[in-house]
């Protein structure tokens, strides 16, 4: 059995003080073990992410957890600079999925130490964390309980989540359906908690993407879907104005507890701090889009759209299918007066294969200009 490091300094990328041009991606926490920083620059290297740590004077082994997301082409590459000295190792080109890559030995002076993540390509370099270890044992690479416990211990996070209250209703997922459920329940007098794993509400309709809600709508959906001048939905403002509603932003639900086959509480983890909380209620509404509560509790789940005959739903398709969330390279277009440059992306056809779809182009959030 591999031994885990018992001491050292774990620097989570999501805790960097200045992300620079890097962005926080927290949607794959359950699949790879942590939120991470993403250098999404459309082919132009993004500005550096920086932070400062305090460390005891001494010699440390360094590991960086990164991902080579297209191993045949290595599009997302970056370096790590420590107190002005750039390590020789270039991360994101070792042909491996999420992996703690050893980067050598460094002597730290014993005072503040400055760390810099420097993007080399602008094509989605990914950095999860940096570990300074006193011994030779490498950090745990998995997402099991042992790896989670190791991270908690080094970050000073309690083993048990903080009790953050009891509510009448807990809604998991802050897309349009989740916001609608939370707002309706709050206006009916219920004490509601809404848990959302992103920094914005609205899902695909939020300012992060900007699509207009489709399908059947009602007055609450139309109310939530109005936009501010910056393009964001007014959903957060409406919920903040409700005394019965509490929103937990950037929290990902990772477990649920049952009593006599009924969900009694859920646990959630904050994307930036790792703080873990527990929320209780007699009623839970799963608007995650991924049936996470069903999965955590062992309930039967379905993938895609069931047929009309299965449950007698009038709006269901005649035949079942596997349609679900969109998978596309999303982009915005505008007319120009000259030919625009386009970066070389030799891996693109390997990722997209033979799929193409030009629907859903936006000129700005909420305003589509595609077919």
Question: What kind of region is each of these model predictions?
Answer:
Residues 187-205:
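Glycine-rich FAD pyrophosphate-binding loop
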Residues 163-175:
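Beta1/beta-strand and adjacent pyrophosphate-binding region of the FAD-binding site
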Residues 182, 186:
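Gly/Ala-rich phosphate-binding loop of Rossmann-like dinucleotide-binding domains
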Residues 128, 168, 282:
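Conserved acidic residues
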Residues 208, 214-371:
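Aromatic-residue-lined binding/catalytic grooves and analogous aromatic/hydrophobic interfacial grooves
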Residues 1-161:
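Extracytoplasmic
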Residues 67, 174, 197:
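Cofactor-binding loop segments of dinucleotide-utilizing enzymes, especially the Rossmann-like FAD-
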């Amino acid at each position: 059995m591999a031994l885990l490091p018992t001491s050292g300094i774990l620097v989570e990328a999501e805790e960097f003080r200045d992300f620079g041009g890097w962005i926080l991606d927290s949607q794959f926490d359950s699949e790879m073990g942590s939120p991470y920083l993403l250098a999404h620059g459309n082919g132009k290297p993004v500005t550096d992410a920086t932070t400062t740590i305090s460390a005891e004077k001494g010699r440390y082994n360094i590991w960086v957890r990164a991902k080579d997301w297209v191993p045949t082409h290595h599009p997302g590459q970056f370096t790590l600079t420590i107190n002005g000295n750039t390590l020789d190792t270039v991360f994101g080109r070792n042909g491996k999925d999420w992996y703690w890559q050893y980067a050598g030995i460094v002597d730290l002076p014993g005072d503040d130490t400055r760390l810099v993540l420097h993007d080399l390509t602008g094509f989605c370099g990914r950095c999860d964390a940096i570990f300074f270890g006193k011994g030779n044992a490498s950090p745990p690479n998995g997402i099991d309980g042992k790896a989670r416990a190791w991270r908690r211990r080094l970050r000073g996070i309690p083993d048990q989540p903080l009790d953050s209250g009891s509510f009448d209703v807990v809604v998991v997922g802050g897309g349009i359906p989740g916001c609608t459920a939370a707002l309706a329940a709050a206006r009916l007098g219920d004490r509601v908690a809404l848990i959302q794993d992103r920094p914005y509400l609205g899902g695909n309709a939020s300012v992060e993407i900007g699509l207009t809600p489709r399908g059947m709508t009602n007055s609450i959906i139309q109310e939530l879907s109005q936009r501010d001048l910056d393009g964001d939905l007014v959903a957060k403002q409406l919920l903040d104005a409700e005394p019965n509603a509490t929103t937990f932003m950037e929290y990902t639900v990772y477990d649920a507890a049952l009593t006599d086959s009924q969900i009694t509480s859920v646990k959630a983890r904050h994307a930036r701090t790792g703080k873990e909380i527990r929320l209780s209620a007699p009623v839970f509404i799963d608007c995650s889009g991924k049936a996470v509560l069903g999965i955590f509790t062992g309930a039967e789940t379905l993938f895609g759209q069931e047929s009309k005959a299965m449950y007698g739903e009038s709006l269901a398709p005649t035949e079942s299918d596997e349609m679900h969330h969109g998978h596309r390279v999303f982009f915005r277009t505008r007319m120009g007066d000259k030919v625009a440059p386009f970066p070389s992306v030799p891996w693109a056809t390997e990722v997209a294969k033979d799929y193409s779809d030009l629907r859903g182009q936006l000129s700005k959030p909420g305003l589509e200009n595609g077919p």
